[in-house]
């Protein structure tokens, strides 16, 4: 690749004595795996910048699945994430690593990701709003076209006074059943607008995204979620991403 692309490191691991194997999220090519030769060496100027949450410009070469990183330059300092915001950022990175197709462009999602990190870095409260908005944006970019505004059974507009039950690959059906898969019309209208004016709609958004993401994640638990539970003090309700 001759030109530069904007990118973030999603995950990195040592490779040989001096190199790094990196998963990148790039603006034009989506998720890429690159080998950063010599990046762990004493004289490498890449050590400090090949870290998660640092906006980068990168170039690579190669024709196989694993490319060779040729250049990387930080666009700015790493976004300052700490505490629950740091674990939330790691959760978002793990989601992208798990669900994105390799070398498939998600240019709109790249900016949703950047906005999510900026929201986390600028927040002094809960990460919940930023995470739920990003999850819904990611599902939309994956082609998970859930219609929150119409009943899948009748085609009628969702009523804020009724209850609807989610059915995978179909959508929301009007129902008298109230269980884990049930949502009020008011909650669905909030999800459609990606707005969470109160704790009830925020909890509903979290419940829906966990249901919707489950087929993508399979039975393998998210490591970042377990780390959050281990190292961040929990209130009575589950605060993990």
From Swiss-Prot:
Gene Ontology cellular-component terms listed: bacterial nucleoid
Keyword Acetylation among record annotations: no
Cited Gene3D superfamilies: Nucleic acid-binding proteins, Recombination protein O, C-terminal domain
Keyword line: DNA damage, DNA recombination, DNA repair
Record bears the keyword DNA damage: yes
One Pfam family per UniProt: RecO_C
Highest taxon above the source species: Bacteria
Biological function: Involved in DNA repair and RecF pathway recombination.
Official protein name in the record: DNA repair protein RecO
Lineage, uppermost ranks: Bacteria, Pseudomonadati, Pseudomonadota, Gammaproteobacteria, Enterobacterales
Gene that this polypeptide is encoded by: recO
């Amino acid at each position: 690749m001759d030109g530069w692309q904007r990118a973030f490191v999603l995950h990195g691991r040592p490779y040989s004595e001096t190199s790094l194997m990196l998963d990148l999220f790039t603006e034009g090519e989506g998720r890429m795996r690159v080998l950063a030769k010599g990046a762990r060496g004493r004289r490498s100027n890449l050590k400090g910048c090949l870290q998660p949450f640092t906006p980068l410009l990168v170039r690579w070469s190669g024709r196989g699945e694993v490319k060779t990183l040729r250049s990387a330059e930080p666009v700015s300092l790493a976004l300052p994430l700490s505490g629950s915001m740091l674990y939330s950022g790691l959760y978002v990175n793990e989601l992208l690593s798990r669900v994105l197709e390799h070398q498939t462009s998600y240019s709109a999602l790249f900016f949703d990701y950047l906005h999510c990190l900026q929201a986390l870095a600028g927040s002094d409260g809960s990460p919940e709003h930023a995470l739920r908005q990003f999850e819904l944006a990611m599902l939309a970019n994956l082609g998970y076209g859930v219609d929150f505004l119409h009943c899948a059974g009748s085609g009628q507009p969702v009523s804020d006074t009724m209850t609807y039950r989610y059915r995978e690959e179909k959508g929301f059906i009007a129902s008298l059943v109230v269980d884990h898969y049930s949502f009020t019309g008011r909650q669905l209208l909030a999800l459609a607008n990606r707005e969470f004016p109160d704790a009830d709609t925020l909890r509903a958004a979290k419940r829906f995204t966990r249901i919707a993401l489950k087929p993508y994640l399979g039975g393998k638990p998210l490591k970042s979620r377990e780390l959050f539970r281990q190292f961040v003090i929990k209130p009575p309700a589950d605060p993990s991403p």
